[in-house]
Amino acid sequence: MQQAAAPKISFVSLGCPKALVDSERIITRLRAEGYELARQHDGADLVIVNTCGFLDSAKQESLAAIGEAMAANGKVIVTGCMGAEPEQIEAAYPGVLSITGPQQYESVLDAVHRAKPALHNPHLDLVPEQGIRLTPRHYAYLKISEGCNNRCSFCIIPKLRGDLASRSAADVLREAEKLVAAGVKELLVISQDTSAYGVDLKYAESPWKDRSVRAKFIDLARELGELGAWVRLHYVYPYPHVDEVIGLMTEGKVLPYLDIPFQHASPDVLKLMKRPAAQDKTLERIKRWRAQCPDLALRSTFIVGFPGETERDFEFLLDWLDEAEIDRLGAFKYEPVAGAPSNALEGQVPDEVKQERWNRLMARQQAISARRLKRKVGTRQQIIIDEIGPTVAKGRSKADAPEIDGSVYLTSRRPLRVGEIVTAKIDRADAYDLHGTVAGF
C-alpha cells in the first residue's frame, strides 16, 4: 500500500532576525510533525506568511506577500508582528485562514492542523536536535529574550511583542551548545534589548553543567564565550554595564563587535525620541572602549528627519559621527508608525529634507568607513567563509555581521570550505569591503 504524501507548506519569513528565529521555531515544529516544506506557493497545501509590522513600508511588503500567497495558493495563515493588529490584513484579505501575532507558535500550529492535518510517519518525525534553521549551517541567530521595557517614542515593538521576557541562562546555553555541536561557527546574539537581558528575572540563577549561571548580560556573554564559537552581540542598548563586556573582547571570549542602536546624537532629538541623551559621555565611553580593545568594531543605526530635527541637530549628528568613527552604519528616514507617540510631535520634516539629510549622512559614513578600512591594509585578519566563487571566496571579518555589514573577498591557492575560518592578509580596501589573500600559501 502506497504511503500517503506528506502535506506541504510554503513559508515566507519577513522582517528582522528575531522574526527569522520565530520562523525557525514554527518550521521545526512542523517538520517534527511530518510536514514538508514546498519551494513554491502553488505546489503547497497552504502558505504561512510571517509578517513585519514595524514600519508602514514593512506593512506594505507584508501585505504584498500575503496577496501573492493568496493569488498563487488561496490557503494562507498569517502570523508575526503585523498580525498583532489584524484589522488591516482582514480588510485587505478577508479570506485568510488565520491571523496571529508574534511568538504565537501554538496558534499557528493549531491553524495548520485545522487546514491540513498532519500524517504521522515515524520516518518523517526526525528533526535535528538543534531544530530547523533558515540560515547557512555555519552561523545561527540565538534569541535570548522577547519584548522590550523601553518606550521610545517612535517604536511600537512593546505593543507588538510585549515587555521584556528573558529566557533562563541555562536554556540559552543549552541551545547554543547544541548549535555549536551541529557545526555552527558563529552565534549571533539577538533580542529587542540584549543588554537588558535578565532584568525581568531579577538575574535569577539556573543550573548549567557543574555550576549556576545568572541571567545577566555579562554572565551570559562570558559563558557563551567558552563554547568555542564566534559570539557576536547585537541590539545592545548602551547601559553603563555594557562597559564590562569590553574585557571579554580583549580576552578573545566574544568578538570585538558591538551593535548599538544610538538612533541620533543631538540631545534635543534624543529627548524627543525618549532615548538616553548623554551622547557626550557616549563619546568618552567609545574612546575608552577602543583604548581597551583597539580592534573593536561599532555598528549602529540612526534615524534622520525625526519630528523636530533641525538642521543644527543634523549637523551635530554629522560632527558626532566624525568623532565617534562608527564602523558600520544603517540609516533610516523617519516614517510615522501607527500607534507611535512620535506621530503627535510638532515639527514634522518634509520628505525632500529627509532624503537630502539621508544622502549627506550616508556620504559622510562612506568616507568614515573607507578611512577605517584603509587602516587594515597590510594586516592579517581572521575571516569566516560564506560563499565560494569560481575565482574568489566571499567571507567576513570579526568586524562584519552577515547580511548587514561588509564582506572580505579572498583568493587562495588551496580549496576553501564554507564555514571555514582562515587567516588572510588584507591587500586593499574600498569604501565598505576588503580584499585579500589567504595567508600561508
Swiss-Prot record:
Residues 134-371 form the Radical SAM core domain. Its EC number is 2.8.4.4. GO terms for biological process: tRNA modification. Binds 2 [4Fe-4S] clusters. One cluster is coordinated with 3 cysteines and an exchangeable S-adenosyl-L-methionine. PROSITE patterns: MTTASE_N, MTTASE_RADICAL, RADICAL_SAM, TRAM. [4Fe-4S] cluster 2 binds at C148, C152, C155. Keywords: 4Fe-4S, Cytoplasm, Iron, Iron-sulfur, Metal-binding, S-adenosyl-L-methionine, Transferase. It is an enzyme of class 2 (transferase). Its cofactor is [4Fe-4S] cluster. The keyword Cytoplasm applies. Residues 7-117 form the MTTase N-terminal domain. Belongs to the methylthiotransferase family. RimO subfamily. Catalyzes the methylthiolation of an aspartic acid residue of ribosomal protein uS12. This is Ribosomal protein uS12 methylthiotransferase RimO. It comes from Rhodopseudomonas palustris (strain HaA2).
